[in-house]
A protein has these predicted regions:
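Internal, well-folded beta-alpha domain core
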Residues: 97-138
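Phosphate-binding glycine-rich loops and adjacent basic patches that engage nucleotide phosphates
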Residues: 16-22, 52, 75-81, 115-123
Length: 138
């Protein structure tokens, strides 16, 4: 298996998506290079963040997704969950391959994990808002 190592930034993830299409490598795993524990038999490719490539992917996502779904992808990225980042990578790849209704396919394990991560992030956001409200009222 091929592993794409990126710096952990959102633009780094989007650059990895661009690179996967450029190199025609679709069955890849992405990981942050600081936390990656490699295997002797796996190939690793270090992805250097390129804002131009990332912006091209962002522009394509804006055209393919509703603004709400576009924001949800970034929200799931903020979870800092490695498996969720792989799910986001997979979702973006499928969107650019032409599967426009990919986010509604709950039969796919990657999509299901993505939605579960979104739910976790939104729950944490709600708790933080409640905590801040509680602090302000005192």
């Amino acid at each position: 298996m091929i592993h794409y190592l990126f710096d952990g930034s959102y633009y780094g993830l989007l650059t990895a998506v661009f690179e996967s299409f450029e190199r025609k490598n679709f069955n890849v795993n992405i990981a942050e290079k600081d936390y990656f524990l490699g295997s002797m038999f796996d190939e690793t490719v270090e992805i250097i963040t390129d804002t131009e490539k990332a912006k091209r992917v962002l522009d394509g996502l804006k055209k393919k997704l509703k603004s709400q779904d576009f924001q949800k992808i970034y929200c799931a990225f903020l979870s800092e969950d490695q498996k969720a980042r792989n799910a986001i990578f997979y979702i973006i790849q499928q969107l650019f391959k032409g599967q426009d209704a990919i986010l509604d396919n709950f039969g796919d394990d990657q999509i299901l994990y993505y939605h579960q991560t979104l739910k976790k992030v939104n729950r944490e956001k709600h708790r933080m808002k409640a905590f801040i409200r509680f602090q302000i009222s005192n």
